[in-house]
Amino acid sequence: MSDRRQNRKTPDEQRKANALIINENIEAYIAICKEVGLNGDEMLILENGIAIEKAIRICCDGKYQEKREKKAREAQRADSNFNADSIGIRLVKRAGSGTNITYHAVVELTSRSRIVQILKSHWGNELNRAKIAGKRLGFSALFASNLEAIIYQRGRNAARRNGSAELFTLTQGAGIETRYKWIMEKHIGIGVLIADAKGLINGKREGKKGVDANVKLRAGTTGSPLERAMQGIEKKAFPGPLRALARRVVKANYNDAREALNVIAEASLLLKPQITNKMTMPWCMWLAARLTLKDEFANFCAYAGRRAFEVFNIAMEKIGICSFQGTIMNDDEIESIEDKAQVLMMACFGLAYEDFSLVSAMVSHPLKLRNRMKIGNFRVGEKVSTVLSPLLRFTRWAEFAQRFALQTNTSREGAQISNSAVFAVERKITTDVQRVEELLNKVQAHEDEPLQTLYKKVREQISIIGRNKSEIKEFLGSSMYDLNDQEKQNPINFRSGAHPFFFEFDPDYNPIRVKRPKKPIAKRNSNISRLEEEGMDENSEIGQAKKMKPLDQLAK
């Protein structure tokens, strides 16, 4: 048995270790909230939490700060009052009490040096070390990337620029900030690393600076950024010819290198790459869970397994989500809190590319497809309509899929072989094998004859799966369970519907350009409440109930 396996923590030990880090994050978050004037329930407003974490990531980004200071020096020549250290954070604050509570947006000023000082007091002085701030902020950046994947389909745009838009399901973590990308490599899709490698190959051809820099590689060695990218791709790629292709890219000529990367990406739609899935919540949600669980909190500090679903549910009971005027499609439309709760759930669990019918079977309320949602960008808007706690909860749970490679020479009992699954639940293959074969058949090697042989072997692997597609199942023997079924006594069978969350698959479709027709919205009188607008007495039993319940419960 390897030392690594011998030193592996038990679930209880792992949760306790997680709790130490999570509690330090919470304390730093509370201190920064107080620094910018947030108190009590204001710290539990989701949009405030997202804004604070973004400010922390910016303040810890040395290269960003260098650029900012350079611009500041230029600006100071024109304006002597310009302060490069100043940072503004847009937040939601509460005013009033009892039944007269209102919310409004404000910009609070603080300084980068003050935020860094607070972080050092809670995490230690070496914020540049990956083990100190890197992993903490890496998970924060991963959540932000998951959010953007759902709202804007960032991965599709990246895939279109670097090959085919059909590869977007390989782009988990496409929006993650560059400085956290290598720290979070095992949580990032192979398509993101392939896009980076193509950028480096193009940069080398164009003579750009930095492409030949010395960076740290595995096993303590150093090499070029392209070598680092290809090491990551080789580790993630399906065993066999795809990994052999990855090893050839660094020394290949421009055309062969790009085509080899295209083959790896297109084949990975079916010959699935390795990726690690975890639940990641904003720190305001961890704070909400701690306030409820108190002494039991450490037992729920889990990123996977049943307790990850439980702690998410507990946090959802206490957080507040804002409804602003203005959605992605319509500046006059009011956001739906229930839709934002769905996006939050999908971002925490990284479910943008999971089978939507499976996700729908695991939660308490009906879910919507992306094109039917009324959501903004989760930043603090100008006009706050209301702040409510959402009702959405998980009612079932499943183990997270770690996506280890399928061995085609076994009795077809390998792990799942599509690239979108997050949960290890048995299902049929949903990948379009014929389309993958069409993509691969377009590829021809230019000069390096061994590449042609490797391409042939890749096609053979695809064909084996294609011929046996009806018999092969992903995650054979794995199921979902009721949330109270801790011992997995009663597995729940799932019949795959293969429904995507993103309703369209037209590669030329851009959700930002396609606008829904604006619906006329009656202007509200800001001096009266919504209940009065509906002709209801705020102090009546029905009025009090409507005021306290989230929107999705009001519809019942």
UniProtKB/Swiss-Prot annotation:
Q: Which SUPFAM superfamilies match?
A: flu NP-like (SSF161003)
Q: Where is this region: Disordered?
A: 516-556
Question: Which Pfam families does the entry link to?
Answer: Flu_NP
Q: Share the record's PTM remark.
A: Late in virus-infected cells, may be cleaved from a 56-kDa protein to a 53-kDa protein by a cellular caspase. This cleavage might be a marker for the onset of apoptosis in infected cells or have a specific function in virus host interaction.
Assembly, in brief, is:
Homomultimerizes to form the nucleocapsid. May bind host exportin-1/XPO1. Binds to viral genomic RNA. Protein-RNA contacts are mediated by a combination of electrostatic interactions between positively charged residues and the phosphate backbone and planar interactions between aromatic side chains and bases.
Q: Name the protein family.
A: Belongs to the influenza viruses nucleoprotein family.
User: What is the name listed in the Swiss-Prot or TrEMBL entry for this protein?
Assistant: Nucleoprotein
Q: Which organism is it from?
A: Influenza C virus (strain C/Johannesburg/1/1966)
